[in-house]
Amino acid sequence: MNSGRRSLMSATASLSLLLCIFTTFVVVSNGELQRFIEPAKSDGSVSFIVIGDWGRRGSFNQSLVAYQMGKIGEKIDLDFVVSTGDNFYDNGLFSEHDPNFEQSFSNIYTAPSLQKQWYSVLGNHDYRGDAEAQLSSVLREIDSRWICLRSFVVDAELVEMFFVDTTPFVKEYYTEADGHSYDWRAVPSRNSYVKALLRDLEVSLKSSKARWKIVVGHHAMRSIGHHGDTKELNEELLPILKENGVDLYMNGHDHCLQHMSDEDSPIQFLTSGAGSKAWRGDINPVTINPKLLKFYYDGQGFMSARFTHSDAEIVFYDVFGEILHKWVTSKQLLHSSV
Protein backbone atom coordinates (compact mmCIF):
# COMPACT_ATOMS: atom_id res chain seq x y z
CA MET A 1 0.00 0.00 0.00
CA ASN A 2 2.83 2.41 0.93
CA SER A 3 4.54 1.59 -2.36
CA GLY A 4 1.33 2.33 -4.28
CA ARG A 5 0.86 5.57 -2.37
CA ARG A 6 4.42 6.64 -3.12
CA SER A 7 3.88 5.87 -6.81
CA LEU A 8 0.68 7.94 -6.81
CA MET A 9 2.44 10.83 -5.05
CA SER A 10 5.32 10.62 -7.53
CA ALA A 11 2.93 10.68 -10.48
CA THR A 12 1.06 13.63 -8.96
CA ALA A 13 4.33 15.52 -8.45
CA SER A 14 5.37 14.83 -12.03
CA LEU A 15 2.02 16.07 -13.31
CA SER A 16 2.33 19.23 -11.20
CA LEU A 17 5.78 19.88 -12.64
CA LEU A 18 4.46 19.51 -16.17
CA LEU A 19 1.62 21.90 -15.40
CA CYS A 20 4.08 24.46 -14.05
CA ILE A 21 6.18 24.18 -17.19
CA PHE A 22 3.24 24.60 -19.53
CA THR A 23 1.74 27.58 -17.70
CA THR A 24 4.30 29.65 -19.58
CA PHE A 25 2.36 28.88 -22.75
CA VAL A 26 -1.31 29.67 -23.07
CA VAL A 27 -2.92 28.54 -26.31
CA VAL A 28 -5.85 30.55 -27.61
CA SER A 29 -8.01 28.49 -29.96
CA ASN A 30 -10.56 31.10 -31.03
CA GLY A 31 -9.24 31.73 -34.52
CA GLU A 32 -6.45 34.07 -33.46
CA LEU A 33 -2.75 33.28 -33.68
CA GLN A 34 -1.35 30.91 -31.08
CA ARG A 35 -0.33 32.84 -27.99
CA PHE A 36 2.51 32.41 -25.48
CA ILE A 37 2.64 34.21 -22.14
CA GLU A 38 5.84 35.82 -20.82
CA PRO A 39 5.21 37.52 -17.45
CA ALA A 40 6.91 40.87 -16.95
CA LYS A 41 9.45 41.25 -14.14
CA SER A 42 8.39 42.52 -10.71
CA ASP A 43 9.32 46.07 -11.73
CA GLY A 44 7.05 45.81 -14.77
CA SER A 45 9.87 45.84 -17.33
CA VAL A 46 10.53 43.43 -20.20
CA SER A 47 13.99 42.80 -21.69
CA PHE A 48 15.04 40.63 -24.59
CA ILE A 49 17.74 40.12 -27.22
CA VAL A 50 17.12 39.94 -30.97
CA ILE A 51 19.41 37.86 -33.20
CA GLY A 52 19.01 36.74 -36.80
CA ASP A 53 20.72 34.76 -39.57
CA TRP A 54 22.96 32.83 -37.22
CA GLY A 55 23.09 29.00 -37.45
CA ARG A 56 26.54 28.13 -38.84
CA ARG A 57 27.93 25.67 -36.26
CA GLY A 58 29.83 28.50 -34.57
CA SER A 59 31.65 29.76 -37.66
CA PHE A 60 31.71 33.30 -39.07
CA ASN A 61 31.97 34.65 -35.50
CA GLN A 62 28.70 33.04 -34.42
CA SER A 63 30.35 31.80 -31.22
CA LEU A 64 31.79 35.22 -30.45
CA VAL A 65 28.41 36.88 -30.96
CA ALA A 66 26.85 34.24 -28.70
CA TYR A 67 29.42 34.98 -25.99
CA GLN A 68 28.62 38.69 -26.04
CA MET A 69 24.90 37.94 -26.05
CA GLY A 70 25.41 36.03 -22.83
CA LYS A 71 27.17 38.96 -21.18
CA ILE A 72 24.58 41.49 -22.28
CA GLY A 73 21.77 39.10 -21.39
CA GLU A 74 23.01 39.00 -17.80
CA LYS A 75 23.41 42.78 -17.70
CA ILE A 76 19.84 43.51 -18.86
CA ASP A 77 18.25 40.67 -16.85
CA LEU A 78 17.07 38.94 -20.01
CA ASP A 79 13.53 37.56 -20.16
CA PHE A 80 13.71 35.77 -23.53
CA VAL A 81 15.44 35.75 -26.93
CA VAL A 82 13.91 36.55 -30.33
CA SER A 83 15.25 34.99 -33.54
CA THR A 84 14.36 36.73 -36.79
CA GLY A 85 14.91 33.62 -38.92
CA ASP A 86 17.46 31.89 -41.11
CA ASN A 87 18.13 29.83 -38.03
CA PHE A 88 20.15 27.07 -39.74
CA TYR A 89 22.38 27.38 -42.81
CA ASP A 90 22.61 26.75 -45.62
CA ASN A 91 19.37 24.88 -46.12
CA GLY A 92 17.61 24.72 -42.77
CA LEU A 93 17.35 21.32 -41.08
CA PHE A 94 16.95 18.12 -43.11
CA SER A 95 14.90 16.51 -40.32
CA GLU A 96 14.01 16.90 -36.66
CA HIS A 97 17.03 14.71 -35.88
CA ASP A 98 19.51 16.85 -37.84
CA PRO A 99 22.66 17.29 -35.68
CA ASN A 100 22.87 20.86 -36.96
CA PHE A 101 20.24 21.80 -34.38
CA GLU A 102 22.52 21.07 -31.46
CA GLN A 103 25.71 22.07 -33.30
CA SER A 104 24.36 25.51 -34.21
CA PHE A 105 22.03 26.18 -31.28
CA SER A 106 22.33 24.11 -28.10
CA ASN A 107 26.14 23.91 -28.17
CA ILE A 108 26.62 27.59 -29.05
CA TYR A 109 24.26 29.62 -26.86
CA THR A 110 25.43 28.15 -23.56
CA ALA A 111 25.62 31.23 -21.33
CA PRO A 112 23.44 31.04 -18.19
CA SER A 113 21.57 34.21 -19.17
CA LEU A 114 20.54 32.66 -22.51
CA GLN A 115 18.82 29.68 -20.89
CA LYS A 116 15.44 31.28 -21.50
CA GLN A 117 12.79 30.71 -24.14
CA TRP A 118 13.85 31.41 -27.73
CA TYR A 119 10.98 32.57 -29.94
CA SER A 120 11.83 32.03 -33.60
CA VAL A 121 10.33 32.54 -37.04
CA LEU A 122 11.39 30.78 -40.23
CA GLY A 123 13.58 32.49 -42.81
CA ASN A 124 13.95 31.71 -46.51
CA HIS A 125 16.96 29.45 -45.83
CA ASP A 126 14.87 27.51 -43.30
CA TYR A 127 12.26 26.90 -46.00
CA ARG A 128 14.96 25.33 -48.20
CA GLY A 129 15.15 22.38 -45.82
CA ASP A 130 12.46 20.53 -43.90
CA ALA A 131 10.54 23.53 -42.59
CA GLU A 132 8.29 21.29 -40.52
CA ALA A 133 11.32 19.99 -38.60
CA GLN A 134 11.93 23.34 -36.91
CA LEU A 135 8.29 23.41 -35.78
CA SER A 136 8.45 19.92 -34.30
CA SER A 137 8.02 19.23 -30.58
CA VAL A 138 10.94 16.80 -30.93
CA LEU A 139 13.32 19.77 -30.95
CA ARG A 140 11.80 21.04 -27.71
CA GLU A 141 12.54 17.65 -26.18
CA ILE A 142 16.17 18.07 -27.21
CA ASP A 143 16.36 21.69 -26.02
CA SER A 144 13.38 23.07 -24.10
CA ARG A 145 14.31 26.67 -24.97
CA TRP A 146 13.29 26.25 -28.60
CA ILE A 147 9.92 27.64 -29.71
CA CYS A 148 9.41 28.02 -33.46
CA LEU A 149 6.09 28.42 -35.25
CA ARG A 150 5.11 29.94 -38.55
CA SER A 151 3.14 32.82 -36.99
CA PHE A 152 2.24 33.41 -33.34
CA VAL A 153 1.99 35.95 -30.51
CA VAL A 154 4.14 36.48 -27.41
CA ASP A 155 2.22 38.37 -24.73
CA ALA A 156 4.66 39.96 -22.28
CA GLU A 157 2.01 42.11 -20.58
CA LEU A 158 2.99 45.66 -21.53
CA VAL A 159 4.66 44.37 -24.72
CA GLU A 160 2.91 42.20 -27.28
CA MET A 161 4.95 40.67 -30.10
CA PHE A 162 3.39 39.36 -33.30
CA PHE A 163 5.60 36.91 -35.20
CA VAL A 164 4.83 36.68 -38.93
CA ASP A 165 5.88 34.05 -41.46
CA THR A 166 7.15 36.35 -44.22
CA THR A 167 8.80 33.90 -46.64
CA PRO A 168 5.52 32.87 -48.34
CA PHE A 169 4.87 36.54 -49.15
CA VAL A 170 7.87 36.75 -51.51
CA LYS A 171 6.71 35.85 -55.01
CA GLU A 172 10.14 35.27 -56.52
CA TYR A 173 10.64 32.21 -54.29
CA TYR A 174 7.87 30.51 -56.25
CA THR A 175 9.08 31.52 -59.71
CA GLU A 176 12.82 32.28 -59.49
CA ALA A 177 14.19 29.89 -56.90
CA ASP A 178 17.77 30.00 -58.29
CA GLY A 179 18.03 26.22 -58.16
CA HIS A 180 16.78 26.02 -54.58
CA SER A 181 13.86 23.88 -53.50
CA TYR A 182 11.40 25.36 -50.99
CA ASP A 183 9.26 23.35 -48.60
CA TRP A 184 5.79 24.62 -49.51
CA ARG A 185 3.86 21.68 -47.99
CA ALA A 186 1.96 24.02 -45.66
CA VAL A 187 1.52 26.68 -48.37
CA PRO A 188 -0.50 25.02 -51.15
CA SER A 189 -1.63 28.45 -52.37
CA ARG A 190 0.43 31.59 -51.85
CA ASN A 191 -2.53 33.97 -52.05
CA SER A 192 -4.86 32.04 -49.75
CA TYR A 193 -2.07 31.47 -47.19
CA VAL A 194 -1.10 35.15 -47.09
CA LYS A 195 -4.73 36.28 -46.98
CA ALA A 196 -5.50 34.02 -44.01
CA LEU A 197 -2.33 35.07 -42.20
CA LEU A 198 -3.07 38.78 -42.66
CA ARG A 199 -6.63 38.24 -41.43
CA ASP A 200 -5.46 36.43 -38.29
CA LEU A 201 -2.77 39.04 -37.64
CA GLU A 202 -5.24 41.90 -37.97
CA VAL A 203 -7.64 40.22 -35.54
CA SER A 204 -4.82 39.80 -33.01
CA LEU A 205 -3.57 43.37 -33.44
CA LYS A 206 -7.03 44.88 -33.07
CA SER A 207 -7.70 42.94 -29.87
CA SER A 208 -4.34 43.86 -28.32
CA LYS A 209 -4.37 46.14 -25.26
CA ALA A 210 -0.58 46.18 -24.95
CA ARG A 211 1.27 49.42 -24.37
CA TRP A 212 3.84 48.46 -27.02
CA LYS A 213 3.10 46.48 -30.19
CA ILE A 214 5.96 44.83 -32.07
CA VAL A 215 5.81 42.78 -35.27
CA VAL A 216 8.66 40.34 -36.03
CA GLY A 217 9.37 38.84 -39.45
CA HIS A 218 12.36 37.57 -41.37
CA HIS A 219 12.28 39.91 -44.37
CA ALA A 220 12.87 43.64 -44.22
CA MET A 221 10.34 46.31 -45.06
CA ARG A 222 12.93 49.08 -45.06
CA SER A 223 16.59 48.31 -45.68
CA ILE A 224 19.62 49.66 -47.53
CA GLY A 225 21.33 46.28 -47.18
CA HIS A 226 21.96 43.66 -49.86
CA HIS A 227 18.34 42.52 -50.18
CA GLY A 228 16.73 45.91 -49.63
CA ASP A 229 13.01 46.50 -49.18
CA THR A 230 10.57 43.61 -49.59
CA LYS A 231 7.93 44.88 -51.99
CA GLU A 232 5.24 42.39 -51.01
CA LEU A 233 5.51 43.27 -47.32
CA ASN A 234 5.25 46.98 -48.01
CA GLU A 235 2.19 46.43 -50.16
CA GLU A 236 0.34 43.82 -48.08
CA LEU A 237 1.63 43.84 -44.49
CA LEU A 238 2.74 47.41 -43.75
CA PRO A 239 -0.74 49.00 -44.14
CA ILE A 240 -2.09 46.68 -41.43
CA LEU A 241 0.77 47.66 -39.11
CA LYS A 242 0.07 51.35 -39.63
CA GLU A 243 -3.67 50.96 -39.11
CA ASN A 244 -3.19 49.14 -35.81
CA GLY A 245 -0.63 51.29 -34.02
CA VAL A 246 2.40 49.03 -34.31
CA ASP A 247 5.49 50.66 -32.80
CA LEU A 248 8.35 48.52 -34.15
CA TYR A 249 9.01 46.06 -36.95
CA MET A 250 11.99 43.76 -36.31
CA ASN A 251 13.58 41.59 -39.00
CA GLY A 252 16.68 39.82 -40.24
CA HIS A 253 17.47 38.68 -43.83
CA ASP A 254 20.03 41.41 -44.52
CA HIS A 255 23.19 40.40 -42.67
CA CYS A 256 23.66 43.70 -40.92
CA LEU A 257 22.39 45.87 -38.08
CA GLN A 258 20.12 48.71 -39.08
CA HIS A 259 17.61 51.29 -37.82
CA MET A 260 15.30 53.22 -40.12
CA SER A 261 12.21 55.36 -39.53
CA ASP A 262 9.04 55.52 -41.58
CA GLU A 263 8.05 58.50 -43.70
CA ASP A 264 4.45 58.86 -42.58
CA SER A 265 4.02 56.85 -39.38
CA PRO A 266 5.81 56.39 -36.02
CA ILE A 267 6.90 52.83 -36.93
CA GLN A 268 10.62 52.11 -36.53
CA PHE A 269 12.27 49.43 -38.69
CA LEU A 270 15.00 47.46 -36.88
CA THR A 271 17.20 44.91 -38.65
CA SER A 272 19.11 42.34 -36.60
CA GLY A 273 20.44 39.80 -39.10
CA ALA A 274 24.11 39.79 -38.15
CA GLY A 275 24.32 36.67 -36.00
CA SER A 276 27.15 35.13 -38.03
CA LYS A 277 28.17 35.74 -41.64
CA ALA A 278 28.19 39.44 -42.53
CA TRP A 279 30.44 42.02 -44.20
CA ARG A 280 28.77 41.74 -47.63
CA GLY A 281 30.05 45.19 -48.49
CA ASP A 282 27.20 46.18 -50.79
CA ILE A 283 24.63 48.82 -49.95
CA ASN A 284 21.46 49.55 -51.89
CA PRO A 285 21.02 53.19 -52.86
CA VAL A 286 18.75 55.05 -50.46
CA THR A 287 15.58 55.67 -52.47
CA ILE A 288 13.77 57.38 -49.61
CA ASN A 289 14.62 60.39 -47.48
CA PRO A 290 18.18 59.73 -46.23
CA LYS A 291 17.23 61.34 -42.92
CA LEU A 292 15.12 58.27 -42.21
CA LEU A 293 18.28 56.14 -41.93
CA LYS A 294 19.31 56.34 -38.28
CA PHE A 295 22.01 53.67 -38.22
CA TYR A 296 23.65 51.02 -40.42
CA TYR A 297 26.45 48.56 -39.63
CA ASP A 298 27.71 45.96 -42.09
CA GLY A 299 29.15 43.52 -39.56
CA GLN A 300 28.32 40.89 -36.95
CA GLY A 301 26.33 41.73 -33.86
CA PHE A 302 22.91 41.73 -32.23
CA MET A 303 20.30 43.95 -30.63
CA SER A 304 18.79 44.28 -27.16
CA ALA A 305 15.46 45.81 -26.21
CA ARG A 306 14.08 46.94 -22.86
CA PHE A 307 10.55 48.22 -22.28
CA THR A 308 8.78 49.85 -19.37
CA HIS A 309 5.29 51.32 -19.34
CA SER A 310 6.62 54.67 -20.52
CA ASP A 311 9.98 54.02 -22.20
CA ALA A 312 11.69 51.80 -24.75
CA GLU A 313 15.44 51.41 -25.23
CA ILE A 314 16.97 49.70 -28.27
CA VAL A 315 20.73 49.02 -28.30
CA PHE A 316 22.87 47.54 -31.09
CA TYR A 317 26.14 45.74 -30.20
CA ASP A 318 29.06 44.49 -32.27
CA VAL A 319 30.93 41.20 -31.94
CA PHE A 320 33.03 42.69 -29.11
CA GLY A 321 30.01 43.80 -27.10
CA GLU A 322 30.62 47.46 -27.87
CA ILE A 323 27.57 49.69 -28.22
CA LEU A 324 27.18 50.88 -31.80
CA HIS A 325 23.83 52.66 -31.60
CA LYS A 326 21.24 53.40 -28.92
CA TRP A 327 17.71 54.66 -29.47
CA VAL A 328 15.35 55.68 -26.68
CA THR A 329 11.73 56.71 -26.97
CA SER A 330 9.07 57.71 -24.47
CA LYS A 331 5.33 57.37 -24.95
CA GLN A 332 4.59 59.76 -22.11
CA LEU A 333 6.65 62.58 -23.53
CA LEU A 334 5.74 61.72 -27.12
CA HIS A 335 9.23 62.35 -28.42
CA SER A 336 12.33 60.33 -29.10
CA SER A 337 16.07 60.89 -29.06
CA VAL A 338 19.03 59.21 -30.72
From Swiss-Prot:
It is found in: Secreted. Its cofactor is Fe cation; Zn(2+). Glycans are attached at N61. The keyword Protein biosynthesis does not apply. Fe cation binds at D53, D86, Y89, H255. Keywords: Glycoprotein, Hydrolase, Iron, Metal-binding, Oxidoreductase, Secreted, Signal, Zinc. This is Purple acid phosphatase 17. It comes from Arabidopsis thaliana (Mouse-ear cress). The lineage of its organism: Eukaryota, Viridiplantae, Streptophyta, Embryophyta, Tracheophyta.
